[in-house]
């Protein structure tokens, strides 16, 4: 990723050392994302994120705090829901800070808790966790338990079983539960995958 500065309308490319010097002058402790251990937090703009996994040249992260608390949407289908749109807005904001190329699109499996696949899968630049991803990262997530319930993408069931009301969520203790899509007001914690070569603040 190239870095530029504009002075009097003239665009000049900065070396990595110059970038780090500028950041240091503003009091930022700037490090490469790839150097941050799983379970540590980093700051990107106003967001504090937990490192969940380092894999090759990418890093999986989740917001430490909720970006909002709200109802899930108009049904228990994540695709196009209110929480889906909030995550997309989060991804757009992140891309403005670190560059679009550094936010990696991932597949969100919308398989229901009972195994039904009515909702298929979607591709997103930021999303909520699925139940499978929560299980994958549970030991890291347990170190950062919020004091409130928060949404996952996974539906309890689907129209095939005449059930479109419930969505999986996580309790303050870290257990799975179910929330009504239009009643429960739960937290939104976006998950994303970023290029691990970027610089972040600690």
Give names to the regions the model predicted.
Residues 2-202:
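Collagenous Gly-X-Y triple-helix signature in extracellular proteins
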């Amino acid at each position: 990723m190239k870095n530029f500065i504009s002075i009097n309308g003239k665009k000049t490319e900065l070396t990595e050392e110059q970038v780090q010097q500028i950041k240091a002058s503003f009091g930022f402790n700037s490090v490469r994302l790839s150097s941050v251990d799983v379970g540590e937090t980093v700051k990107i703009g106003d967001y504090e994120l937990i490192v969940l996994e380092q894999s090759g040249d990418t890093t999986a992260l989740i917001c430490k705090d909720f970006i909002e608390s709200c109802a899930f949407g108009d049904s228990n289908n994540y695709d196009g829901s209110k929480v889906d749109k909030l995550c997309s807005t989060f991804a757009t904001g992140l891309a403005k800070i670190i560059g679009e190329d550094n936010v990696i699109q991932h597949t969100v499996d919308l398989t229901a808790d009972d195994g039904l696949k009515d909702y298929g899968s979607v591709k997103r630049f930021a999303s909520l966790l699925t139940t499978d991803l929560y299980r994958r990262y549970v030991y890291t997530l347990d170190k950062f338990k919020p004091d409130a319930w928060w949404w996952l993408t996974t539906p309890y069931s689907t129209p095939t079983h005449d059930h479109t009301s419930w969505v999986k969520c996580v309790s303050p203790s870290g257990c799975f539960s179910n929330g009504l899509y239009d009643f429960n007001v739960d937290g939104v914690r976006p998950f994303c995958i970023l290029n691990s070569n970027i610089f972040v603040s600690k």
